[in-house]
Regions:
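Surface-exposed binding/hinge segments that line
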Residues: 15, 46, 114, 149-195
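N-terminal lobe/hinge region of extracytoplasmic solute-binding protein
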Residues: 54-106, 137, 206-210
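Acidic-aromatic pocket-rim loops
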Residues: 67, 282, 340, 347-348, ...
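Gly/Pro-rich hinge or "lid" segments in bacterial periplasmic/extracellular proteins
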Residues: 87-89, 184-238, 242, 251-252, ...
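Ligand/substrate-recognition segments at binding pockets and active sites
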Residues: 220, 335, 369, 373-445, ...
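Ligand-site clamp/hinge motif
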Residues: 230-276, 314, 402, 406, ...
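Structural transition elements
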Residues: 336-378, 394-398
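Extracytoplasmic/peripheral linker and loop segments enriched in polar/acidic and small residues
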Residues: 365, 415-426, 451-521, 545
């Protein structure tokens, strides 16, 4: 018999029934998340079955190097391999994927990787070091017509060599503290060099990888599916026959989880949604919860007035009561923590005592709003009206965050309207600067300043800087922290970077997220991590029959 917690509400008088249901939901949510209880009946992996899971919206295109949203990662990750990857069971440890072994030189400026032999693309062609080089050349030096969102993360790389078909060597112009983690980025899908030579934009519209699952179809507006790659280089994997992604709203996903139509949604549910599902489905579900390397940000288009004036940007950031926002939004969204540019609780995070001295983070909202009004008057801006561009088809947390911001601006006399776009339109607006102010996403796969601060580096160096700003002081600090080998010195540089960035307020954090994943209790082999991007190739997961 399975060792599962009993969480079903007992019968009782009507006046006590509601209370018991709420206690039952809490019981399940807590017990199922405890080590040794959740998954206590798991055994050796079993083969077979198709995993159905939900994604809120469809990807705008298929290119890993150009995208930054989970709607792309969750559907394409099973088709691709990366050089390294994170071991989610022992996060943040890094493990090999295509790399069988690797070596870092004593000066940390040369990284040598030995690749697994006999790795095949899904068209039967053999992967070699040339494919790795071509993929990273595309990331570091994207050709015309190709967008490499995380290009700034790899500024240290000066050259890539392929001395033989199974060896690739990266040379750096300076030692980068985050480089090994960057080689494990889930976004660095390895593409076919031959296909890229024919058409550098091939990955935008086609799927051809070496991952555990072969692409089957994308039926727009309905689903995405993949099947097991029988020639996958990791012997015995994957365990699943395939997977099927249903493109449905978060609300529909809650009902689908309750009915058993889907087995997972890998991004997050809200606390209230979790309680509803556990109340309805009880111990058929497993709940996992943890910190999240993601926050909602507010980006201002610095190339257009009035947001080319830092005083105006800072005023609109000062108007926002972030501390009050956590209380208002924590239960109906997963917006939970106030923090700066580094995840609250992480090693490089700014302590609260220092954070509250930075513009926009004070607990004295009355004083902050008085300063906001003063700055607007000083800048000569009156009767300000702002269109806030936002994401429509992934409503949580974007919609509530946008409404919250607009309400906060009204407190200083700024009127705003909400422009709601599809993910594809929203992403295009951010990339092309077709907005005045926008709700933006800051989501990463690892807590490291080189990765986390790249979106604040000048736009000509970092395409992920949606504000379009140029700030050579931040650029210098960014390189300075990356090459620093002294932890205390690096932390000081990061603090200076953070204070300058939130004062200039081209892009500012709103609230950090808390991840809450609900899945079928029969779904095994998957571990929650602080990022919704890693651990999604599905090579290790299986379904208990």
């Amino acid at each position: 018999m399975k060792n599962e917690p009993t969480c079903a509400p007992a019968d009782g008088p009507a006046e006590r029934r509601w209370m018991r249901r709420r206690l039952a939901a809490t019981c399940c949510a807590v017990l199922l998340a405890l080590p040794g209880i959740a998954g206590a009946a798991s055994s050796s992996p079993q083969r077979g079955g198709t995993l159905p899971f939900a994604v809120d919206a469809e990807p705008p295109n298929y290119d890993c190097h150009a995208n930054f949203s989970f709607v792309l990662m969750h559907v394409v990750a099973p088709h691709y391999s990366t050089l390294l990857k994170f071991d989610t069971a022992n996060y943040p440890q890094v493990a090999g994927d295509l790399a069988d072994s690797w070596n870092v030189s004593p000066d940390r400026r040369t990284y040598t990787f030995k690749l697994h032999p006999n790795v095949l693309f899904h068209d039967g062609s053999k992967l070699t070091s040339a494919d790795v080089k071509a993929s990273y050349d595309r990331i570091v030096h994207p050709p015309e017509g190709v967008l490499s969102v995380r290009q700034a993360d790899y500024a240290a790389i000066t050259s890539i060599e392929t001395p033989d078909p199974l060896t690739v060597v990266f040379h750096l112009q300076w030692p980068d503290a985050a480089m090994l983690a960057n080689f494990a980025s889930p976004w660095n899908c390895i593409y076919s060099a031959a296909k890229l030579a024919e058409d550098p934009t091939f990955p935008k519209t086609h799927i051809l990888g070496t991952g555990p699952f072969v692409f089957v179809e994308h039926v727009k507006g309905d689903h995405w599916s993949g099947k097991r790659w029988d020639k996958y280089f990791q012997q015995g994997k994957p365990y699943l026959d395939g997977y099927r992604t249903e493109f449905i709203s978060e609300t529909a996903a809650v009902k689908a989880m309750e009915s058993g139509r889907i087995m997972a949604q890998f991004r997050s549910f809200t606390p209230s949604e979790r309680d509803e599902m556990v109340e309805m489905a009880g111990n058929r579900l497993e709940v996992r919860e943890g910190p999240w390397t993601s926050y909602v940000a507010l980006a201002f288009n610095t190339t257009q007035p009035p947001f080319n004036d830092a005083r105006v940007r800072r005023a609109l950031s000062l108007a926002i009561d972030r501390w009050g926002g956590t209380e208002a939004l924590a239960n109906t969204t997963f917006l939970k923590y106030v923090g700066g540019l580094m995840r609250p609780g992480s090693a490089m995070a700014t302590p609260e005592a220092e954070l509250v001295t930075m513009p926009g983070f004070s607990r004295d909202i009355a004083a902050s709003r008085a300063e906001a009004k003063r700055l607007l008057a000083e800048a000569g801006v009156t009767n300000l009206e702002v269109t806030l561009t936002n994401r429509k088809d992934v409503p949580v947390p974007y919609g509530p965050a946008g409404e919250f911001v607009l309400a906060q601006w009204r407190e200083i006399g700024v009127r705003g309207t909400h422009e709601l776009l599809s993910t594809k339109e929203w992403q295009a607006a951010l990339e092309k600067g077709k907005f005045a102010a926008a709700i933006d996403l800051a989501a990463d796969y690892f807590d490291d300043p080189t990765i986390n601060l790249a979106r604040y580096v000048s736009r000509d160096l970092s395409p992920s800087n949606h504000a379009g700003s140029t700030d050579r002081f931040l650029d210098a600090l960014y390189i300075g922290q990356a090459i620093s080998t002294d932890t205390r010195e690096r932390m000081k540089i990061v603090r200076d970077f953070e204070r300058h960035a939130v004062t200039e307020a081209s892009t500012v954090p709103l609230l950090w997220w808390n991840r809450l994943v609900v899945s079928s209790a029969k779904f095994k082999g998957w571990n929650i991590s602080p990022s919704q991007y890693i651990g999604q190739d599905l090579s290790d997961v299986w379904i208990e029959q």
